[in-house]
Amino acid sequence: MFADLDYDIEEDKLGIPTVPGKVTLQKDAQNLIGISIGGGAQYCPCLYIVQVFDNTPAALDGTVAAGDEITGVNGRSIKGKTKVEVAKMIQEVKGEVTIHYNKLQADPKQGMSLDIVLKKVKHRLVENMSSGTADALGLSRAILCNDGLVKRLEELERTAELYKGMTEHTKNLLRAFYELSQTHRAFGDVFSVIGVREPQPAASEAFVKFADAHRSIEKFGIRLLKTIKPMLTDLNTYLNKAIPDTRLTIKKYLDVKFEYLSYCLKVKEMDDEEYSCIALGEPLYRVSTGNYEYRLILRCRQEARARFSQMRKDVLEKMELLDQKHVQDIVFQLQRLVSTMSKYYNDCYAVLRDADVFPIEVDLAHTTLAYGLNQEEFTDGEEEEEEEDTAAGEPARDTRGAAGPLDKGGSWCDS
């Protein structure tokens, strides 16, 4: 239909400038340059690049991009031709092919419309839904096949729970060891006092030796705490810095991923709209005026895909490094814990083995039960006070028969 009008329809460029240019591409072994073409007669006055495939001559060269208009092939104009005819023209050329183009100077911000933002929000909501739930709510579900980062994220959450549990358990363990060391210290102080006050030399030496053993155990406990405490610092660094940093990177990755999926969905909707109108014989205004809106979305999709690929690569590398650190760090920390506790128990066993002083012989009769001339009778302070109160409150009575001091024969004498 545009052949009859000689393409005199004014193009609606939406304020997007174009810059002409040309590029020479060396074809690959399959005689391809790695682009797909859209537009052309009979509904669109221009032909444009829909997609540049990865690892192809066009992608490696980087000159042309999605949305750029193709104006000629090897100096031959393609005006009024269909996309199939232009594809054949490119295929007929062997070796190098020169593509003449009009570079679309598009700003990605122009493509970030409210529709794209709403699509990103919808993708966030649908991401964690099952297929059945999404279908029941009437929501289309655009997903990336074989997206292993979803499983990696689940593994990261499990690793975070593991480190959190290890941190709490280690804190409780250190607290228990600290209280145990204080108990050993108290034991040592008590036995040391007993040893100092014990009149029997052998028993005194035994109590002091047993006290020193408990004080040594207390020192072993403090040494254990100083050795294991850095383990908490390392675990907290991994738990509170490395994992949150990876989560933040994953959130950025998901944002780029949802943006890319939103542009893909937008392109699909615009394609369906165009096919429906063509089927009805009513071409769209945007198509008949150069399809610049569609080409802008194509450019935005390509740039979003590039950001998505780069971000995905960065996330995979970071998670790989995090996994390696997790494997190495967890082994090192557990070895430190086990070796430190083993040394602690071995040292405690060695000290207590050398301090095997039981049974201890103590002359209780000599120390607490024997009464002699030079020993004072044991009296309780409270009983003395009661006796004084009684003596003050009662009248004087005959003291005959009252208990007197012990004589040399050990018998009581009258006063």
From Swiss-Prot:
The entry's keywords: Actin-binding, Calcium, Cytoplasm, Cytoskeleton, Lipoprotein, Membrane, Metal-binding, Palmitate, Phosphoprotein, Synapse, Synaptosome, Zinc
Phosphothreonine carried by residues: 82
Residue ranges with Acidic residues bias: 377-391
Superkingdom of origin: Eukaryota
Spans annotated as Disordered: 376-415
Ligand binding (Zn(2+)): 44, 46
Domain AH: 144-357
Molecular function GO terms recorded: actin filament binding; Arp2/3 complex binding; metal ion binding; phospholipid binding; protein domain specific binding; protein kinase C binding
Subunit record text: Monomer and homodimer. Interacts with CXADR. Interacts presynaptically with the glutamate receptors GRIA2, GRIA3, GRIK3, isoform 3 of GRIA4, isoform A of GRM4, GRM7 and GRM8; with NAPA and NAPB; and with BTG2. The interaction with NAPA and NAPB disrupts the interaction with GRIA2, conducting to the internalization of GRIA2.
Modified how: Phosphorylation at Thr-82 appears to inhibit the interaction with AMPA receptors. Palmitoylation on Cys-413 is essential for long-term synaptic depression (LTD).
One Pfam family linked to the record: PDZ
InterPro entries, sorted: AH/BAR_dom_sf, AH_dom, Arfaptin_fam, PDZ, PDZ_sf, PICK1_BAR
Name of this chain's protein: PRKCA-binding protein
Subcellular location: Cytoplasm, Perinuclear region; Membrane; Postsynaptic density; Synapse, Synaptosome
Major subcellular site: cytoplasm
Organism: Pongo abelii
Bilayer topology term: Peripheral membrane protein; Lipid-anchor
Function in brief: Probable adapter protein that bind to and organize the subcellular localization of a variety of membrane proteins containing some PDZ recognition sequence. Involved in the clustering of various receptors, possibly by acting at the receptor internalization level. Plays a role in synaptic plasticity by regulating the trafficking and internalization of AMPA receptors. May be regulated upon PRKCA activation. May regulate ASIC1/ASIC3 channel.
One Gene Ontology biological process: intracellular protein transport
PDZ domain sequence ranges: 22-105
Record remark: domains: The AH domain mediates binding to F-actin.
Highest classification ranks of the organism: Eukaryota, Metazoa, Chordata, Craniata, Vertebrata
